[in-house]
Amino acid sequence: MNRNDKQAYDRGTSLFSPDGRIYQVEYAREAVKRGAPVLGVRTADGVVLAALRSTPSELMEAESIEKLHKLDDALGAATAGHVADARKLVDFARTTAQREHLRYGEPIGVETLTKTITDNIQESTQSGGTRPYGASLLIGGVENGSGRLFATDPSGTPQEWKAVAIGGHREDVQAALEDGYAEDLSLEDGLALAVEALVAADEEIESDELNLVTVSEAGYEIVDEETIAELFADATADDESDETDEREE
């Protein structure tokens, strides 16, 4: 396909190219890749969500960057990509969860909420005068006593995962998750794995750049800075030990 032919399909959000692609959706995925990495880990006790909170300047308040969000008492989300788009999706998710709680007197299911969100995302790929959301979400929660973890895509596709990373350095973070994941992980093990995976992707990060939450039957809980510092120290110590072993070999 030559340049002029591509441009004919490049401007519309609801047009397929002859080779079956929607270019605006692909551009939205690129926006997600430009964001700082976030990840989720499903454990035997619930779900861990973690994010790297990087700032473009030392003068910017890191606390102003929100990437982990409480949706309901036992539901949380992590976001990557275009911040304003992510905020709109988080607001939509919260409203949906609250409406379901008020209507039926019980929390919305993790899968039900995810599919409602992705239905909303998918509509933006079929309507003229709109553009796809340049953000992806990880939705984690507890359903029927078990943790569940889903990821959304700018195309509106939901996927369930045991452990997954989105955003920048995704391949490196995902590889670390695959190396360390086990079905019987506890929440504490999941927190350790989350920090190890983010450290593996960027060895220059500091502990105060990390945010972690757990979502379990106890609810949505923010991990305190002291615990994060301990997890970070353990992860970096393990990394240094591995490098020493490699040099000795």
Swiss-Prot record:
Record flagged with keyword Ribosomal protein: no
> Could you say how this protein's activity is regulated?
The formation of the proteasomal ATPase PAN-20S proteasome complex, via the docking of the C-termini of PAN into the intersubunit pockets in the alpha-rings, triggers opening of the gate for substrate entry. Interconversion between the open-gate and close-gate conformations leads to a dynamic regulation of the 20S proteasome proteolysis activity.
Annotated keywords: Acetylation, Cytoplasm, Proteasome
Where it sits in the cell: the answer is: Cytoplasm
Gene Ontology CC: cytoplasm; proteasome core complex, alpha-subunit complex
**Where is the PTM N-acetylmethionine found along the chain?**
M1
- For this UniProt entry, which segments traverse the membrane? none
- Reply yes or no: does the keyword Nucleus apply: no
What upregulates it?
Up-regulated at mRNA and protein levels during transition from exponential to stationary phase.
Q: Give the chief site where it resides.
A: cytoplasm
Alphabetized InterPro entries for the sequence: Ntn_hydrolases_N, Proteasome_alpha, Proteasome_alpha-type, Proteasome_asu_arc, Proteasome_asu_N, Proteasome_sua/b
Per the UniProt entry, the signal peptide is: none
Q: Tell me, what does this protein do in biology? A: Component of the proteasome core, a large protease complex with broad specificity involved in protein degradation. The H.volcanii alpha1-beta-alpha2 proteasome is able to cleave oligopeptides after Tyr and thus displays chymotrypsin-like activity.
Family from the record:
Belongs to the peptidase T1A family.
Q: How does it assemble?
A: The 20S proteasome core is composed of 14 alpha and 14 beta subunits that assemble into four stacked heptameric rings, resulting in a barrel-shaped structure. The two inner rings, each composed of seven catalytic beta subunits, are sandwiched by two outer rings, each composed of seven alpha subunits. H.volcanii produces at least 2 types of 20S proteasomes: an alpha1-beta proteasome and a proteasome containing all three subunits (alpha1, alpha2, and beta) that appears to be asymmetrical with homo-oligomeric alpha1 and alpha2 rings positioned on separate ends.
Query: Can you name this protein?
Result: Proteasome subunit alpha 2
Q: Which organism is it from?
A: Haloferax volcanii (strain ATCC 29605 / DSM 3757 / JCM 8879 / NBRC 14742 / NCIMB 2012 / VKM B-1768 / DS2) (Halobacterium volcanii)
What is the gene name? psmA2
